[in-house]
Amino acid sequence: CESLISNASGAKNWVFWHHWPDAKLHDYGAGQGLELLTKDAAQQLSSDDFWAFVERLATGRRLVITSDHGYAATGYFPDADGEVAAYLKKTFSSGRSKAGNGETSPFIPPVALHIDSPHGPHLLAVGRRKWRSQGGYPTLTHGGLSLLEVLSPFIELTK
């Protein structure tokens, strides 16, 4: 990103998108996502290079830092049991969404939600629960419908 700014014109309206930290999350092994992502974020966001980059972007313009989703430490979610666990495992396997139509279950509160999106119908697991699955359950997820996954920062800086 730094080289883009150095070679860019004096335009004030820029949009930068970066794959960090998602790319890191996908590179980490099972059970390591939360700890390694936290350490990496602390290192990156406290570095002099990062803050010099932010200062350069914020000088003479409005800088907004945001994200397209949040993260949930699903490894700390309580285990579902009984019929709920069986339904979630059968429906979602090790994930939290499934393309297509299907039963959303008779559970109160609901454990699944049906949506029709531009990409077709989907079932989504809702709530803070996890279930046993072959290969283990991910300790950190993103892109789902839990509160932590839909919260996104919105930070505005001007210099």
Q: What residues fall within each predicted segment?
A:
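Feature captures the catalytic ectodomains and active-site-proximal regions of enzymes
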Residues: 1-159
